A protein has these predicted regions:
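ATP-dependent carboxylate activation and anion-phosphoryl transfer catalytic cores
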Residues: 3-175
Length: 175
């Protein structure tokens, strides 16, 4: 339990020892293309905006990655997503749990686009406008090694802010 300054309580159930990961995808209502899967470095329960993350995942097995892909595709289709979707997961003992799904562009899409040298926002925009379907694009992500997303904190400019990381985002940006 985390007491918020506005006197509301945020109850957040979590899985002890879970690894957090997230997937971003483009969906045209029928077909889904996973643009990237990132593994968080901080423990599950730290806000995704405050967590370092690795693209592609460094410690997730093929079974887990396939479950993430399957869940992402099913959720995107079930929500009738046309455009981008971000789905966050908790993984414990190779079992994948869904934390949340956001049918919108997430803060990780520009990071993935830059890492893979693919204009995913342009593709998604064309899909949303009905100009193209997912199958119309020739996706060819290129990368070598790993890309790391790192949060930027401005605690020195806001000295009275609680610095303890948790389910509410504290960072002011990412690099």
């Amino acid at each position: 339990m985390y007491k918020r300054q506005d006197n509301n309580l945020l109850l957040d159930h979590y899985l002890d020892g879970a690894i957090e990961a997230e997937a971003d995808a483009i969906c045209d209502g029928e077909d889904v293309y996973i643009i990237g899967i990132m593994e968080h470095i901080e423990p599950c329960g730290i806000h995704s905006g405050d967590s370092n993350a690795c693209l592609p995942p460094f410690n997730l097995g093929d079974l887990v990655i396939q479950q993430i892909k399957d869940h992402t595709k099913k959720i995107a289709k079930a929500l009738n997503t046309v455009g981008l979707i971000n789905v966050q997961f908790a993984i414990v003992n190779d079992k994948v749990y869904i934390i949340e799904a956001n049918p919108r562009a997430s803060r990780t899409v520009p990071f993935i686009s830059k890492a893979y040298k693919e204009p995913y926002v342009n593709y998604a925009t064309k899909v949303m406008l009905g100009v193209n379907k997912v199958k119309d694009f020739d996706f060819k992500p290129t990368y070598k090694g790993y890309a790391i997303k790192e949060p930027v904190f401005s605690f020195s400019k806001f000295p009275n802010v609680n610095k303890k990381l948790g389910p509410e985002m504290k960072s002011t940006g990412e690099s």
